[in-house]
Amino acid sequence: HLNPLFIYGRSGLGKTHLLRAIQNYINSNMPNLQVVYKDSNELLEDYMDASAAHDTEKSSYKNFKMYYEEADVLLVDDVQQLQGKKQTLDIMFQIFNKLTSQGKQVVLSADRAPKNIDIDERYKTRFNSGGTFDIQPPEIETKLSIVKSFIREYEDMEQSGPINMPEDVQICIAESSGSNIRELKSAVTNVIVKMKCGEGSDITVADVRKLLENHFSGGPSKRLTADDILKVTEDFFKVSHTDIVGKKRTRNIAHA
């Protein structure tokens, strides 16, 4: 039984999106279940607020615990941010253990494996006690599926009819992107906005390449063409294009 389910991977690979997708799926398909999603910083703030109010309002701390313990599914994002927060970790694990002992599901995410989080060994062991999954950078097929998913998500959010983005444009977005899912999502949004601003379904691959030219921080390496190589060679050896491609061979050109 994958409980807890621990998902990790470097920033930008879509962990938050995945946790939100779990939340949305359960809310849509199992509305009788109570789902709680919290970023670790939000959980920390909830705990600090409850602790600070505890002296004047005895129920505050109890209400804090009840809120989390009444969840059927608890999703906690970026748990590595709880490093050094011993009291918060302690209370989180009390909640954690109570939920799992009742057969309720806990899903956690982090930007590194449990063994690399600077917390007490017993917490690491507990993180590893269910299922631990490493999210890898997506392949092109996966990125294309993500592009299509973001388009559907945008359609549902805007409710302004279907977005007829050409297939070759979708492929171009996927191929141009790196591994950062947030950047991929914003690229899809940028293309949709451009389409809505007058381009419509006539938007081309050339339009998209120009639009996203400097969008991706970790995009694929630029493909070098023969002209690219010639240009670098000409600049380095201080020779002309004609000298390189012509039949004349001086000493400098021969070295080039």
Language model segments and positions:
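Short glycine-rich substrate-engagement loop in P-loop NTPases that contacts/grips substrate
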Residues: N32-V73, K86
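Walker A/P-loop nucleotide-binding motif
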Residues: L2-R20
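Terminal-proximal interaction/regulatory segments of ATP-powered molecular machines
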Residues: D243-A256
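Conserved AAA+ ATPase "sensor/coupling" helix adjacent to the nucleotide-binding pocket
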Residues: G130, L144-E158, K194
